[in-house]
Amino acid sequence: MKTPIEVKILDSRIGSEYPLPAYATPGSAGMDLRAMIETSLSVAPGETRLIPTGISIHVADPSLAAVILPRSGLGHKHGIVLGNLVGLIDSDYQGPLMVSCWNRGDKPYTIEIGDRLAQLVFVPVVQAEFKLVDEFDNSLRGEGGFGHSGTS
């Protein structure tokens, strides 16, 4: 099932030199976001840089949100991860998509124009309504915290 999402091209190179974000295979969950920068840039170890993707989206449907997630190869091979770990795009946001790149490695990393930096994934949203209670019904886990599940 495909859901239409409005996209605005902010960088004219998208659609001509670089493709719009798209699913690589029928089973892909995410679409690659690219670095739409003017020139190559270096990210020093420990440094974080905010990189434009050249697009804006408007999800519009309050039952959906978008998340920006890291690409596994960049983190594993080069230490490049998202500076905010995950980017959450609310359904009513209409501004440019940016990727926060953090170099947690020990060498500078060069980002080239058009490099694939992150993935955009759409997820369902459930808005909760809190119900105040004095006690919870008993559960198997109870109040066991970090590292508690699956232990005897």
Curated annotation (Swiss-Prot):
Single Gene Ontology BP annotation: dUTP catabolic process
Catalytic activity of the protein: dUTP + H2O = dUMP + diphosphate + H(+)
Record-listed E.C. numbers: 3.6.1.23
InterPro entries on file: dUTPase, dUTPase-like, dUTPase-like_sf, dUTPase_trimeric
Keyword Nucleus annotated: no
UniProt keyword Metal-binding, yes or no: yes
Binding-site residues, substrate: 71-73, 84, 88-90, 98
Record's keyword terms, sorted: Hydrolase, Magnesium, Metal-binding, Nucleotide metabolism
A Pfam family the protein falls into: dUTPase
Functional note: This enzyme is involved in nucleotide metabolism: it produces dUMP, the immediate precursor of thymidine nucleotides and it decreases the intracellular concentration of dUTP so that uracil cannot be incorporated into DNA.
NCBIfam families: dut (TIGR00576), PRK00601.1 (NF001862)
Family assignment from sequence similarity: Belongs to the dUTPase family.
Annotated protein name in UniProt: Deoxyuridine 5'-triphosphate nucleotidohydrolase
Species of origin: Shewanella woodyi (strain ATCC 51908 / MS32)
Encoding gene per record: dut
